[in-house]
């Protein structure tokens, strides 16, 4: 489906400046998204799962708004790379409301690797 196809373009280390609020105050907007997927249940409930090493302010909500726009054909399925490259908040989709957003888990450190890394997963549930 369109949203899952577009979600694959979010995977990797990118500058997600377009997916955070203006004047965010962060030194770096580069983040790693290790997985992004969209699932639609039979009752039309939409699940958007995003996993990464950390998220910017409203990043998951803006990703969700952008993917919903793509699913509704308000944006092209191949628009994610140009949005990322632009670094322009206005180029991305709307910020989805916080209701339904759930931080599922956080894991610190990677056992056996000697690396200290935070991995978090957020899930956004949207009902019709």
Feature locations, PLM:
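Structured-RNA-binding interfaces characteristic of tRNA pseudouridine synthases
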Residues: 1-128
